[in-house]
Amino acid sequence: MRVLITGVTGFVGSHLAEHCLELGHEVAGTFRWRSRDENLSVVKGKVALHDADLRDPVGVRTVIQAFQPERIFHLAAQSYVHASWASPAETLSTNIISQVNLLEAVREAGLTECRIQVAGSSEEYGMVFPDETPIKETNPLRPLSPYAVSKVAQDLMGYQYHESYGMFIVRTRSFNHEGPRRGEVFVTSNFAKQIAEIEKGLKEPVIHVGNLEAFRDYTDVRDIIRAYILSLEKCESGEVYNIGSGNAWQIGDMLSTLLDYSNVSVEVRQDPARMRPSDVPRLECDASKFKKATGWEPEIPFETTLKDTLDYWRERV
Protein backbone atom coordinates (compact mmCIF):
# COMPACT_ATOMS: atom_id res chain seq x y z
CA MET A 1 0.00 0.00 0.00
CA ARG A 2 1.23 3.51 -0.81
CA VAL A 3 1.37 5.55 2.40
CA LEU A 4 2.08 9.29 2.49
CA ILE A 5 3.11 10.88 5.79
CA THR A 6 3.19 14.66 5.94
CA GLY A 7 5.79 15.91 8.39
CA VAL A 8 7.68 12.63 8.10
CA THR A 9 10.88 13.98 9.66
CA GLY A 10 9.08 14.87 12.88
CA PHE A 11 8.68 13.02 16.14
CA VAL A 12 5.53 11.06 15.31
CA GLY A 13 6.12 10.94 11.55
CA SER A 14 9.48 9.20 11.86
CA HIS A 15 8.11 6.52 14.21
CA LEU A 16 5.11 6.03 11.92
CA ALA A 17 7.34 5.69 8.85
CA GLU A 18 9.37 2.94 10.53
CA HIS A 19 6.24 1.03 11.51
CA CYS A 20 4.67 1.34 8.05
CA LEU A 21 7.83 -0.04 6.48
CA GLU A 22 7.76 -2.96 8.93
CA LEU A 23 4.21 -3.65 7.74
CA GLY A 24 5.46 -3.81 4.14
CA HIS A 25 4.02 -0.53 2.85
CA GLU A 26 5.61 1.78 0.30
CA VAL A 27 6.23 5.00 2.24
CA ALA A 28 6.70 8.58 1.09
CA GLY A 29 6.84 11.70 3.19
CA THR A 30 6.86 15.46 2.90
CA PHE A 31 9.28 17.75 4.67
CA ARG A 32 10.36 21.37 4.50
CA TRP A 33 13.86 22.17 3.28
CA ARG A 34 15.09 23.36 6.68
CA SER A 35 13.83 20.27 8.50
CA ARG A 36 16.43 18.16 10.28
CA ASP A 37 16.38 14.54 9.19
CA GLU A 38 18.21 12.73 12.01
CA ASN A 39 14.93 11.14 13.11
CA LEU A 40 14.94 9.18 9.84
CA SER A 41 18.43 7.74 10.26
CA VAL A 42 17.05 4.21 10.71
CA VAL A 43 14.99 4.34 7.50
CA LYS A 44 17.18 6.53 5.31
CA GLY A 45 16.92 5.43 1.70
CA LYS A 46 13.72 3.49 2.37
CA VAL A 47 11.33 6.46 2.46
CA ALA A 48 10.74 8.62 -0.62
CA LEU A 49 11.23 12.17 0.64
CA HIS A 50 9.47 15.10 -1.02
CA ASP A 51 10.65 18.63 -0.24
CA ALA A 52 7.32 20.44 -0.11
CA ASP A 53 5.97 23.36 1.86
CA LEU A 54 2.31 22.41 2.22
CA ARG A 55 1.34 26.08 2.13
CA ASP A 56 2.29 25.98 -1.58
CA PRO A 57 -0.64 24.39 -3.46
CA VAL A 58 1.44 23.67 -6.55
CA GLY A 59 4.03 21.73 -4.58
CA VAL A 60 1.34 19.74 -2.79
CA ARG A 61 -0.42 18.83 -6.04
CA THR A 62 2.89 17.70 -7.52
CA VAL A 63 3.49 15.28 -4.63
CA ILE A 64 -0.04 13.88 -4.68
CA GLN A 65 -0.11 13.39 -8.44
CA ALA A 66 3.33 11.77 -8.49
CA PHE A 67 2.82 9.33 -5.59
CA GLN A 68 -0.93 8.61 -5.84
CA PRO A 69 -1.25 7.72 -2.14
CA GLU A 70 -3.76 5.20 -0.85
CA ARG A 71 -3.34 6.31 2.76
CA ILE A 72 -2.39 9.77 4.07
CA PHE A 73 -1.42 10.53 7.64
CA HIS A 74 -1.51 14.31 7.92
CA LEU A 75 0.90 15.12 10.74
CA ALA A 76 2.69 18.23 9.44
CA ALA A 77 1.93 21.22 11.65
CA GLN A 78 3.26 23.97 13.84
CA SER A 79 2.67 21.83 16.91
CA TYR A 80 4.22 23.80 19.77
CA VAL A 81 1.50 25.47 21.85
CA HIS A 82 3.85 28.00 23.45
CA ALA A 83 5.14 29.20 20.04
CA SER A 84 1.60 29.83 18.87
CA TRP A 85 1.30 32.71 21.32
CA ALA A 86 4.35 34.40 19.78
CA SER A 87 3.35 33.61 16.18
CA PRO A 88 -0.43 33.21 16.00
CA ALA A 89 -0.75 34.19 12.33
CA GLU A 90 1.99 31.79 11.23
CA THR A 91 0.47 29.00 13.31
CA LEU A 92 -2.97 29.50 11.78
CA SER A 93 -1.56 29.82 8.26
CA THR A 94 0.69 26.78 8.55
CA ASN A 95 -1.89 24.46 10.04
CA ILE A 96 -5.05 25.54 8.22
CA ILE A 97 -3.83 26.49 4.73
CA SER A 98 -1.61 23.42 4.55
CA GLN A 99 -4.56 21.14 5.14
CA VAL A 100 -6.75 22.98 2.63
CA ASN A 101 -4.06 22.46 0.01
CA LEU A 102 -3.66 18.79 0.87
CA LEU A 103 -7.37 17.98 0.75
CA GLU A 104 -7.85 19.97 -2.45
CA ALA A 105 -4.93 18.16 -4.10
CA VAL A 106 -6.41 14.76 -3.23
CA ARG A 107 -9.86 15.84 -4.43
CA GLU A 108 -8.58 17.29 -7.70
CA ALA A 109 -6.52 14.16 -8.37
CA GLY A 110 -9.67 12.06 -8.13
CA LEU A 111 -8.21 9.70 -5.51
CA THR A 112 -11.60 8.46 -4.36
CA GLU A 113 -10.16 5.40 -2.59
CA CYS A 114 -7.58 7.37 -0.61
CA ARG A 115 -8.10 7.39 3.16
CA ILE A 116 -6.90 10.38 5.17
CA GLN A 117 -6.24 10.76 8.88
CA VAL A 118 -6.37 14.32 10.22
CA ALA A 119 -4.29 14.45 13.39
CA GLY A 120 -6.08 16.72 15.84
CA SER A 121 -5.25 17.41 19.46
CA SER A 122 -6.72 17.28 22.94
CA GLU A 123 -5.85 20.98 23.10
CA GLU A 124 -9.01 21.54 21.05
CA TYR A 125 -11.06 20.93 24.20
CA GLY A 126 -9.32 23.77 26.02
CA MET A 127 -11.25 24.85 29.09
CA VAL A 128 -12.62 21.61 30.51
CA PHE A 129 -14.67 21.76 33.69
CA PRO A 130 -14.20 19.20 36.50
CA ASP A 131 -17.49 17.44 35.80
CA GLU A 132 -16.49 16.95 32.13
CA THR A 133 -13.57 14.56 32.73
CA PRO A 134 -12.67 12.07 31.40
CA ILE A 135 -13.29 13.93 28.16
CA LYS A 136 -15.54 12.45 25.50
CA GLU A 137 -15.65 13.49 21.85
CA THR A 138 -18.99 15.19 22.49
CA ASN A 139 -17.45 17.67 24.94
CA PRO A 140 -17.64 21.34 23.84
CA LEU A 141 -14.51 22.73 22.20
CA ARG A 142 -13.25 25.80 24.09
CA PRO A 143 -9.71 26.34 22.70
CA LEU A 144 -7.32 28.38 24.83
CA SER A 145 -4.41 28.99 22.43
CA PRO A 146 -3.89 29.94 18.78
CA TYR A 147 -2.55 26.42 18.24
CA ALA A 148 -5.76 24.92 19.62
CA VAL A 149 -7.87 27.19 17.40
CA SER A 150 -5.91 26.00 14.36
CA LYS A 151 -6.49 22.35 15.28
CA VAL A 152 -10.23 22.96 15.73
CA ALA A 153 -10.25 24.41 12.21
CA GLN A 154 -8.40 21.38 10.82
CA ASP A 155 -10.79 19.07 12.62
CA LEU A 156 -13.92 20.75 11.29
CA MET A 157 -12.42 21.04 7.82
CA GLY A 158 -11.93 17.28 7.78
CA TYR A 159 -15.61 16.84 8.61
CA GLN A 160 -16.65 19.35 5.96
CA TYR A 161 -14.65 17.66 3.18
CA HIS A 162 -16.12 14.30 4.14
CA GLU A 163 -19.66 15.68 4.04
CA SER A 164 -19.20 17.88 0.96
CA TYR A 165 -17.17 15.55 -1.25
CA GLY A 166 -17.57 12.09 0.25
CA MET A 167 -13.85 11.85 1.02
CA PHE A 168 -12.75 9.16 3.48
CA ILE A 169 -11.43 11.23 6.38
CA VAL A 170 -11.02 10.16 9.99
CA ARG A 171 -10.34 12.82 12.60
CA THR A 172 -8.34 11.90 15.69
CA ARG A 173 -7.86 13.95 18.83
CA SER A 174 -4.70 12.62 20.40
CA PHE A 175 -3.82 13.47 23.96
CA ASN A 176 -0.18 14.03 24.94
CA HIS A 177 2.21 11.53 23.42
CA GLU A 178 5.84 11.20 24.40
CA GLY A 179 8.95 9.10 23.84
CA PRO A 180 12.37 9.10 22.17
CA ARG A 181 12.86 11.86 19.54
CA ARG A 182 10.35 14.19 21.17
CA GLY A 183 11.40 17.79 20.49
CA GLU A 184 13.16 19.50 23.36
CA VAL A 185 10.64 22.35 23.44
CA PHE A 186 8.02 19.94 24.81
CA VAL A 187 7.89 19.61 28.57
CA THR A 188 8.66 15.91 29.14
CA SER A 189 11.55 15.86 26.68
CA ASN A 190 12.79 19.22 27.95
CA PHE A 191 12.97 17.99 31.54
CA ALA A 192 14.74 14.80 30.42
CA LYS A 193 17.31 16.78 28.45
CA GLN A 194 17.98 19.13 31.37
CA ILE A 195 18.55 16.14 33.68
CA ALA A 196 20.91 14.51 31.16
CA GLU A 197 22.89 17.76 30.88
CA ILE A 198 23.14 18.06 34.67
CA GLU A 199 24.33 14.45 34.92
CA LYS A 200 27.21 15.24 32.54
CA GLY A 201 28.08 18.52 34.24
CA LEU A 202 26.99 20.56 31.23
CA LYS A 203 24.67 22.83 33.21
CA GLU A 204 24.10 23.91 36.78
CA PRO A 205 21.92 21.58 38.89
CA VAL A 206 18.78 23.63 38.34
CA ILE A 207 15.68 22.40 36.48
CA HIS A 208 13.79 25.30 34.92
CA VAL A 209 10.05 24.65 34.81
CA GLY A 210 6.73 26.23 33.92
CA ASN A 211 3.36 25.18 35.32
CA LEU A 212 3.77 21.96 37.33
CA GLU A 213 0.16 21.89 38.53
CA ALA A 214 -1.52 20.92 35.24
CA PHE A 215 -2.61 17.33 34.58
CA ARG A 216 -1.98 15.64 31.23
CA ASP A 217 -2.94 12.28 29.76
CA TYR A 218 0.26 10.70 28.42
CA THR A 219 0.64 7.88 25.90
CA ASP A 220 3.81 6.45 24.36
CA VAL A 221 4.34 7.51 20.74
CA ARG A 222 4.84 3.86 19.78
CA ASP A 223 1.29 3.15 20.94
CA ILE A 224 -0.01 6.27 19.20
CA ILE A 225 1.29 5.24 15.78
CA ARG A 226 -0.43 1.87 16.08
CA ALA A 227 -3.61 3.79 16.83
CA TYR A 228 -3.18 6.01 13.78
CA ILE A 229 -2.82 3.03 11.47
CA LEU A 230 -5.90 1.39 12.98
CA SER A 231 -7.88 4.61 12.59
CA LEU A 232 -7.82 4.28 8.79
CA GLU A 233 -8.53 0.55 8.84
CA LYS A 234 -11.27 0.32 11.45
CA CYS A 235 -12.85 3.73 12.06
CA GLU A 236 -15.81 5.33 10.34
CA SER A 237 -15.23 8.10 7.83
CA GLY A 238 -16.35 11.52 9.03
CA GLU A 239 -16.19 10.55 12.68
CA VAL A 240 -13.87 11.91 15.38
CA TYR A 241 -12.04 9.76 17.92
CA ASN A 242 -10.10 10.50 21.10
CA ILE A 243 -6.82 8.64 21.51
CA GLY A 244 -5.16 8.50 24.91
CA SER A 245 -4.31 6.33 27.89
CA GLY A 246 -7.04 7.51 30.26
CA ASN A 247 -4.46 8.17 32.98
CA ALA A 248 -3.78 11.80 33.90
CA TRP A 249 -0.41 12.68 35.42
CA GLN A 250 0.35 15.95 37.16
CA ILE A 251 3.36 17.49 35.44
CA GLY A 252 5.14 17.84 38.78
CA ASP A 253 4.78 14.09 39.37
CA MET A 254 6.13 13.41 35.89
CA LEU A 255 9.23 15.46 36.76
CA SER A 256 9.64 13.62 40.07
CA THR A 257 9.53 10.28 38.26
CA LEU A 258 12.21 11.40 35.81
CA LEU A 259 14.38 12.52 38.72
CA ASP A 260 13.91 9.10 40.35
CA TYR A 261 15.77 7.64 37.35
CA SER A 262 18.78 9.86 38.07
CA ASN A 263 21.14 10.26 41.01
CA VAL A 264 21.58 14.03 40.68
CA SER A 265 20.32 16.49 43.27
CA VAL A 266 18.64 19.47 41.67
CA GLU A 267 16.82 22.67 42.48
CA VAL A 268 13.47 23.08 40.72
CA ARG A 269 13.06 26.72 39.69
CA GLN A 270 10.01 28.24 38.01
CA ASP A 271 10.76 30.29 34.90
CA PRO A 272 8.10 32.93 34.12
CA ALA A 273 9.00 32.67 30.41
CA ARG A 274 7.75 29.08 30.45
CA MET A 275 4.29 30.03 31.70
CA ARG A 276 1.44 30.34 29.18
CA PRO A 277 -1.02 33.26 29.08
CA SER A 278 -3.75 30.67 29.64
CA ASP A 279 -3.35 26.98 30.32
CA VAL A 280 -5.62 23.96 30.30
CA PRO A 281 -5.73 22.70 33.91
CA ARG A 282 -6.64 19.06 33.24
CA LEU A 283 -6.81 16.87 30.14
CA GLU A 284 -7.89 13.28 30.71
CA CYS A 285 -9.02 11.07 27.86
CA ASP A 286 -12.04 8.86 27.40
CA ALA A 287 -10.93 6.73 24.44
CA SER A 288 -13.74 4.18 24.75
CA LYS A 289 -15.18 5.05 21.32
CA PHE A 290 -11.83 4.44 19.61
CA LYS A 291 -11.11 1.28 21.59
CA LYS A 292 -14.52 -0.15 20.71
CA ALA A 293 -13.99 0.58 17.01
CA THR A 294 -10.44 -0.76 16.78
CA GLY A 295 -9.61 -2.99 19.75
CA TRP A 296 -6.61 -0.75 20.47
CA GLU A 297 -5.11 -0.57 23.94
CA PRO A 298 -1.95 1.26 25.02
CA GLU A 299 0.78 -1.25 25.89
CA ILE A 300 3.78 0.78 27.09
CA PRO A 301 3.69 2.10 30.69
CA PHE A 302 4.41 5.82 31.00
CA GLU A 303 7.28 5.07 33.37
CA THR A 304 8.96 3.17 30.52
CA THR A 305 8.33 6.09 28.18
CA LEU A 306 10.03 8.46 30.63
CA LYS A 307 13.03 6.16 31.08
CA ASP A 308 13.43 5.74 27.31
CA THR A 309 13.21 9.52 26.80
CA LEU A 310 15.88 10.15 29.43
CA ASP A 311 18.15 7.51 27.89
CA TYR A 312 17.60 9.10 24.47
CA TRP A 313 18.94 12.42 25.76
CA ARG A 314 21.78 10.77 27.68
CA GLU A 315 23.08 9.52 24.33
CA ARG A 316 22.85 12.95 22.71
CA VAL A 317 23.94 15.68 25.10
What are these regions (language model features)?
Residues 1-177, 300:
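N-terminal Rossmann-like NAD(P)+-binding domain of SDR-like oxidoreductases, especially those catalyzing
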Residues 190-191, 234-275, 287:
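Mid/C-terminal beta-alpha module of Rossmann-like enzyme folds, strongest
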Residues 55, 86, 94-97, 138, ...:
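Residue-level signal for the nucleotide or nucleotide-sugar donor/cofactor binding architecture
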Residues 128-134, 156-217, 221-232, 246-248, ...:
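NAD(P)-dependent short-chain dehydrogenase/reductase
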Residues 15, 87, 105, 109, ...:
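Generic structural signal for alpha-helix termini and adjacent loop/cap motifs
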Residues 2, 25, 302-317:
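Amphipathic terminal alpha-helices
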Residues 221, 240, 273-297, 301, ...:
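Conserved C-terminal active-site "lid" loop/helix of NAD(P)H-dependent oxidoreductases
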Residues 49, 169, 207, 266-270:
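Generic structural signal for residues in well-ordered beta-strands
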